[in-house]
Amino acid sequence: GCPWDPWC
């Protein structure tokens, strides 16, 4: 996931 969005 992304640092700002765990669902990326």
UniProtKB/Swiss-Prot annotation:
Expressed by the venom duct. One of its GO terms (cellular component) is extracellular region. It is found in: Secreted. GO terms for molecular function: ion channel regulator activity; toxin activity. The keyword Hydrolase does not apply. Its main location: secreted. InterPro entries: Contryphan_CS. Keywords: Disulfide bond, Ion channel impairing toxin, Neurotoxin, Secreted, Toxin. These peptides are not hydroxylated and not amidated, and no D-amino acid are detected. Its target is unknown, but this toxin may modulate voltage-activated calcium channels (Cav) or calcium-dependent potassium channels (KCa). Belongs to the O2 superfamily. Contryphan family. The cysteine framework is C-C. This is Contryphan-Fic. It comes from Conus figulinus. The lineage of its organism: Eukaryota, Metazoa, Spiralia, Lophotrochozoa, Mollusca.
